[in-house]
């Protein structure tokens, strides 16, 4: 995912590393309902998440994989948010335009955490607001994509390596 990280020439600051490690420890102790997340083993600035489609939504049963790409000076700058799995809500492998993403650094608050970013993404996924990186589809189309999501994810090497318990055949 390094092609999405314009700060690849800048190593993360000490404050950035400390903050990201602390946030991962916090998420590990207090998991977010319907969301799994892990940093890349080789790059603390690259986190991978999975949103589990909530019951009674068009996403029910879906497994949606994506990335958070943090800037070297996080939390002073917001991360990029990308979705890999087709959901019918977001374009795949495009930066999402959210107030909690690098699309809107002017609205970013360093007090926001990875947990709040992921909760915001989950909330936005359930909303119908149209913005850069979002797409408009019917609920039926979203349901069809939900049923195909694991087959799609199983073709992604990084997904299978980081979330092997999800990628295993039942």
UniProtKB/Swiss-Prot annotation:
Cited InterPro entries: Ub_conjugating_enzyme, UBQ-conjugat_E2_core, UBQ-conjugating_enzyme/RWD
Alphabetized UniProt keyword annotations: ATP-binding, Nucleotide-binding, Transferase, Ubl conjugation pathway
Pathway the protein acts in: Protein modification; protein ubiquitination
GO BP terms, alphabetized: ERAD pathway; protein polyubiquitination
GO molecular function, one term: ATP binding
Active site: 97 (glycyl thioester intermediate)
Catalytic activity, as annotated: S-ubiquitinyl-[E1 ubiquitin-activating enzyme]-L-cysteine + [E2 ubiquitin-conjugating enzyme]-L-cysteine = [E1 ubiquitin-activating enzyme]-L-cysteine + S-ubiquitinyl-[E2 ubiquitin-conjugating enzyme]-L-cysteine
Pfam families recorded: UQ_con
Gene Ontology CC entries for this record: endoplasmic reticulum; nucleus
Keyword Ribonucleoprotein on entry: no
E.C. code: 2.3.2.23
Superkingdom, natural source: Eukaryota
CDD domains: UBCc_UBE2J
Ranges for domain UBC core: 15-165
Amino-acid biosynthesis listed as a keyword: no
Record-stated family: Belongs to the ubiquitin-conjugating enzyme family.
PANTHER family: UBIQUITIN-CONJUGATING ENZYME E2
Task performed by this protein: Catalyzes the covalent attachment of ubiquitin to other proteins.
Name listed for the protein in its UniProt record: Ubiquitin-conjugating enzyme E2 J2-like
